[in-house]
Amino acid sequence: QKLKDAGADIYPIMSDASQTIESRFGNPDMYIAKIKEITEKEPILSISGAEPIGPKAYLDALAILPCTGNTAAKLANGITDTPVLMAAKAHMRNNKPLVISISTNDGLGMNLKNIGLLCNSKNIYFVPFGQDNYQAKPNSLVAHIDLLIPTLEMALEHKQYQPILKDYL
């Protein structure tokens, strides 16, 4: 909502999981309805719907939020088997910024290498992140979503917002 309030023209893209999995955070129908309400657009829900993002080049930047460990791993290894991953691949062919808002319980575990690969990739920028609960979940990393807008602004200048590592107090 804050992004829309700041004047952004948002094209929502949903992963297969977000379209189908009910969780403690809510159900897919609720999310789709809220996304339509905020963006005033139908979300992109398929790989074929996401592919034209490349040739049409209509996005200034693309943000993946939340970016799960699974999505980060697939992105780092060039796998494009969801609408979000196809959108990222298609968008990046235009040398425009991709902003990642990480949210994974495995960021300092098996996924650390994937986050490292993405941090070292051209045109990929991270919303600053930190350990949200280092005692109960020592490998968990979560982005500071309140820094999404300044991260996007810096990414549009092809700069990483700093510091990229930020404590949760």
Model-derived features: positions:
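A cross-family phosphate/adenosyl-ligand binding-site feature
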Residues: 1-82, 86-98, 105-169
